[in-house]
Amino acid sequence: MELVFLGTGAGVPSRGRNVTSIALSMLNERNAIWLFDCGEATQHQVLRSHIKLSKLEKIFITHMHGDHIFGLPGLLSSRSFQGGDSDLTIYGPAGIAEYVETSLRLSGTRLTYKINFEEIEPGVIFEDEMFLVTADDLDHGVRSFGYRIVEKDKQGALNAEKLKADGVEAGPVFQKLKNGEIVTLADGRVIDGKNYIGEPQKGKIISIFGDTKETVSELELAMNADILVHEATFEGDKAKMAGEYMHSTTLQAANLAKAANVKKLILTHISSRYDRDASKELLIEAKTVFENTEIAYDLAVFQVGE
């Protein structure tokens, strides 16, 4: 899995940063891409990346502010032109269905695929055999969600060396043993596949937050995450301003990462007041509290678990 930051700016696009959108690429895991927020011109950023809209399976909207949703109509239309024909699900606050449907209807846009809308409340919003996604309210004046994506633990690997040492030759029997089945060999021996399977592989946890000021719900959403993606609209000494505008600072994000025992913090949603050099200072500041911090730039790619 990898995170591709398509837009990392706050409020309005700047020369250095487009507005918010993050792609979670899971091509190896489920041959799919999930998108978190879709600010204006996100589809232009997609063209500059390796992301394929035909692989887009789900879109998660954190809140209904324009810098997080104005890119949706164009991106959804372009997905049709790029061969997307599988159903797409959009999760988000109340109003997301009306916004998308109205935009498409008034523009006369006809899609080649079906959109399913899930207007969510806090709790589990999606689960299958591979992933569990939960959401909770943040604090941004309008309803804003944070998302927690949990990859379920994977079965341990089959110990082929141990099987070989026990005189079991590779072949179709390996698949049965990998499934944990009890198998009778040609020589009459009965072996249990569970004795040859290693420890389960721990799944990854990714927490992606919408815009927010400091709030208590953040801690549970972020707890023990492999990656926490958090806004850092302002530098540390502007905490009062951040609170008034319902946003966060670098230090507030770093303190949360430390308290939640996350492995990596990625800062995004950077105000246009900070150019590239000033952004480096934001990173240095956050690292004084939480060392394993990165600051996202447009088109930056981060591997999950590294």
From Swiss-Prot:
Zn(2+) 2 binds at D67, H68, D211, H269. It comes from the Bacteria. Its cofactor is Zn(2+). Binds 2 Zn(2+) ions. It is an enzyme of class 3 (hydrolase). Keywords: Endonuclease, Hydrolase, Metal-binding, Nuclease, tRNA processing, Zinc. Its EC number is 3.1.26.11. The active site is at D67. Signal peptide: none annotated. CDD domains: RNaseZ_ZiPD-like_MBL-fold (cd07717). Belongs to the RNase Z family. HAMAP family: RNase_Z_BN. This is Ribonuclease Z. It comes from Listeria innocua serovar 6a (strain ATCC BAA-680 / CLIP 11262). The lineage of its organism: Bacteria, Bacillati, Bacillota, Bacilli, Bacillales. The gene is rnz.
